[in-house]
Amino acid sequence: MNEELAEVAASTRLAELGITLPAVPAPVAAYLPAVVSAGQVFTAGQLPFVDGHLLETGKVGAGVSPERAAELARVAALNAVAAAASVVGGVDGIRRVVKLVVFVASDPAFTGQPQVANGASELLLSVFGERGRHARSAVGVAVLPLDSPVEVELVVEASAASF
């Protein structure tokens, strides 16, 4: 394999970025944070929790700025990566990111959901490089659990060695 095309391990990228993979946030209801099926990992919706605390509440476009919401989407995406990593033996057990879904609690007039979702997408590209390129949906919704401004779901492919 061409050395220029060789991928850097996700754990190495996290260290280079100064990012520590957080503990998986505890579920707030009767579900699992992530499950593996047919070589893919599906995460539950992840909120922007840090150390057990939701960083912000409210709607984007009415109290929460789009820029702040993009930061929150990044935090929620990191929590989703942690959830996926927890069922495949660590972050290096993730072969590639397949799909990202970002739900944005939006004021009715707000239409910038894709820009909010970029916070999550950019984190995934930073951590996984080309393996972080993904399909994506950015969905505006009326309200999210706990009045969170954003919620993130991931589908990733697990590496064969993680089974």
Give short role names for the model-derived ranges.
Residues N2-F163:
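Short, polar/acidic, helix-capping and beta-turn segments at strand->helix junctions
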